[in-house]
Amino acid sequence: MSIKLEDLHSFNEAVLFKGEEDEAPAPVLLLDKYRVRLVPITELPLVSNYSNTSQLGLNSEEVLVIDSPIESAEKQKTSSLLNRRENKKTIKSEKEDESMDMETAEGDKENTVSETGGGPLVTSFLTLDKLEKDGVNDVEIVGLDCEIQFFDANPIPFEDGISLQRFLRLESSKNFSAAVDKLPIWISTIGHHFPSVCWLAAGRTNKNVQVSGATRILGYFNENSQKLVKQLNEACGAAQVNRYRAVYDVIRKIATPTREAPGEVIIDMRWNTKSSLVLLEQPDNAADCTIKIDLGWGDNRFFIDETIFEQLFFVLNLADVLANPEKEVVFRSESDKFDDLVQEMKQLVEACSHEDNVFASNEKSEQVTDKVWNIVRKCSDVKQATMLFKNFLQALTYGKIKSHVQEGNKSHLASLIRASKTCDFRMPILERLSTIEMMMEIGVESLRGRIINKFSDTLQFPSDELTFILKTCENDLSTLEGTLHSSVVSLLPITMAMATIHQIFGFLNVKDLVVLPDLARRVLTKYTTGMVEKAKRGETETDYVFETTLPLLRMNKEAFMHKRPRIWTCENTNTVGANVQTRAMTTLELEPSLEHVCRLVNASRPVRPIDEDNRKPTEEERNADYTVSHTIFSYLPKL
């Protein structure tokens, strides 16, 4: 029975919706012996390192990945060990609360570069025996939480892969439907000596030219792997131009119990040279640097002012409760003592009772409603907030509050303050939802001013333009049904834009900061329009991703090039006339995403001893951290 495209899509859906406790869905089998899956080519390890996979010219963006349905003994052992360790971590996390100090230290450990290169790389050379011993004794190794997400592959022996490839060349139409038979095929293989072929590829281009390919693992970076690269490139023919790429991880996407949706910052550099290939070649000043910023959701590593972000998410929670009253307000885990808050409110009323002590004489001053917000937001429940509001409103009733509020302050509390000065004041009835709404309104007013001032002062962006953008976004959202309070939601894109621009600010040379205002406008436009468009479809915008490309000349190299590139590649193409004959790519990776490749290379990689005197590793030792691979695609001309 031939394999149909619907079978492959059904399997992918079953995997996507599989629960943690559910059994793995039954694989789609070829000849009752090989697993077949449909995978986007951009997700294939090593091959996805191409600067542009569409340049390969394949007739489909999805390929068939064929491997064994049975995991190797080594993979089963590793999976069992990591599951055991994960269970221990879960039990431990339930017993202990993670403090902010630990979270800060963890962030530094992830992103601060040490003399050994920073990050979790030092742990990638642990043997399985040592890892198993560590798991049994429950000893934590620094950096072990930075686990690599391996691509699911169960390779078959290289000899079997060659036989299968030959069989499919002749018999694929008998085993695949017409739609599946057209797709390119990638066979996962393994050898025990270098160079070891990990991918065998075959297919056709969109011009119906036959393509065959292979990815070889050459070992760790040393003289031998350099010689192999040279020999393989010479076999491909002379290339006129070398196209280089280096990918730097500035902030890594690492989830923690307090950071469930982490963000990341990546700098992807590309440049061309006509000189001979040099592994780990440094970029020239003409290199293009693509800055990719993904803020994640609630990732405090991007917070310029943590109190602003903390209060923003709190106000969003208040708006959510107003829209869904069955939900509860989530107050701070460490709230102040209520007696202290009562005393703070008493002191505020006293300060506001003097006519010569009037807050908010200009837009950047703190209003009395801001003062009230900074007290009530520290409560532990809605009842406490209600009592504090009543104390303040009682003072309004007796005309004790002499302070004024700005004309643009549209909160209900601001209108009550104005009414108290015209003898038109009536004490409102404070119930659960009315208290929450009053809190939300003064929180919005406080945050709006702070965000605009912070954005303007830190990044030198016109405050009146920010005010206009914010108001436009709020008006657009207010016309849509089913959205949360537009005054609250409109603060999100502005705040996220501030975090994004602050990241770019750190990468620019001082003399090139003139480009920042235009970049800020692009970010603001992208985030605000994205939020409005999603709101029109009834969706909530939680994806804040921005990319921009700048020449290396504008970049502050010290801000990111003190790190080592996680991925380094060199691509070259050999042509005969107008036709491409071969495409070759040399790749150096610090963290290959194929587990069997890591295991094979690590078995031969020299283990760098940890010296008590903190000796700096040599360049040769640091280079040995890289795994070297070489991919060749051959295009067979039509006869």
From Swiss-Prot:
Disulfide bonds: none annotated. This is Protein zwilch homolog. One of its GO terms (biological process) is meiotic cell cycle. The keyword Disulfide bond does not apply. It is found in: Cytoplasm, Cell cortex; Chromosome, Centromere, Kinetochore; Cytoplasm, Cytoskeleton, Spindle. InterPro entries: Zwilch. Residues 76-95 have a biased composition (Basic and acidic residues). The gene is zwl-1. Component of the RZZ complex composed of rod-1, czw-1 and zwl-1. Interacts with the spindly-like protein spdl-1. Interacts with NDC80 complex component ndc-80. Belongs to the ZWILCH family. Residues 96-105 have a biased composition (Acidic residues). GO terms for cellular component: cell cortex; RZZ complex; spindle. Residues 76-116 are annotated as: Disordered. Essential component of the mitotic checkpoint, which prevents cells from prematurely exiting mitosis. Required for chromosome segregation, the assembly of the dynein-dynactin and mdf-1-mdf-2 complexes onto kinetochores and spindle pole separation. Its function related to the spindle assembly machinery and kinetochore-microtubule attachments likely depends on its association in the mitotic RZZ complex. The RZZ complex recruits the spindly-like protein spdl-1 to kinetochores. Keywords: Cell cycle, Cell division, Centromere, Chromosome, Cytoplasm, Cytoskeleton, Developmental protein, Kinetochore, Meiosis, Mitosis. It comes from Caenorhabditis briggsae. PANTHER family: PROTEIN ZWILCH HOMOLOG.
